[in-house]
């Protein structure tokens, strides 16, 4: 909201400043492919960081648990939909629009800077690097498609997948506790970015 109000205040062209054009379907599909490939990179990066800094796993798990709600749909809205829209307007809309120039080099720097800022904004040490990688992918796709809706879709997909994974994990853990059966499950919730 603040970036939008500021853009209105400085009389910026809202549609161009925030790249609000609707993308073609092939760009959305391309965004899905980029996210899917990037998901493995951020998952591997997260696992490496957790193996190097095991104490970070507890903090990561606490953060993930704190944002989840009893209602799956409420969690989907709060953890996936709202951040996808608000964070993309700020990072891939306002900041990317402010940083990018006309040259290829300035666009590359803008994509990297916005990605790094996105990672830093998530504060948790274990999440900074994977989230920065994700932010770079989002920024690249927003710039390449000239639409933040591609990155909004990717962001929602990423966080929505994490919400689903957390709920599935919690369901199986409850079943295991209720039936006194032990399941070996990977730390799926560690992917919430």
Feature-to-residue mapping (PLM):
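Hydrophobic residues within alpha-helical transmembrane segments
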Residues: 33-34, 82, 113-117, 129, ...
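Alpha-helical transmembrane segments in multi-pass membrane proteins
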Residues: 1-9, 30
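C-terminal membrane module of polytopic membrane proteins
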Residues: 156-193
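Membrane-interface helix caps and helix-loop-helix hairpins in membrane proteins
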Residues: 120-126
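Membrane-embedded alpha-helical segments of multi-pass membrane proteins
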Residues: 1, 77, 129-137, 157, ...
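Membrane-interface helix/loop boundary segments of multi-pass membrane proteins
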Residues: 86-113, 140-147
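Juxtamembrane helix-loop-helix connectors linking adjacent transmembrane helices
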Residues: 15-86, 176-182
């Amino acid at each position: 909201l603040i970036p939008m109000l500021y853009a209105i205040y400085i009389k910026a062209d809202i549609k161009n400043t925030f790249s609000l054009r609707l993308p073609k379907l092939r760009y959305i599909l391309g965004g899905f492919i980029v996210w899917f490939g990037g998901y493995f990179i951020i998952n591997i990066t997260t696992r490496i960081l957790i193996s190097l800094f095991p104490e970070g796993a507890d903090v990561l798990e606490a953060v993930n648990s704190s944002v989840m709600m009893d209602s799956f749909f409420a969690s989907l809205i709060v953890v996936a939909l709202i951040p996808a829209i608000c964070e993309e307007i700020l990072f891939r809309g306002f900041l990317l629009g402010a940083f990018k120039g006309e040259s290829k080099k300035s666009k590359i720097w803008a994509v990297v800077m916005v990605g790094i800022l996105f990672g830093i904004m998530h504060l948790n040490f274990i999440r900074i690097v994977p989230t920065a990688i994700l932010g770079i992918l989002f920024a690249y796709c927003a710039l390449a498609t000239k639409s933040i809706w591609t990155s909004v879709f990717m962001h929602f997909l990423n966080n929505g997948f994490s919400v689903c994974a957390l709920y599935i994990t919690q369901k199986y853990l409850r079943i295991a506790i209720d039936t006194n059966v032990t399941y070996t499950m990977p730390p799926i919730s560690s992917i919430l970015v």
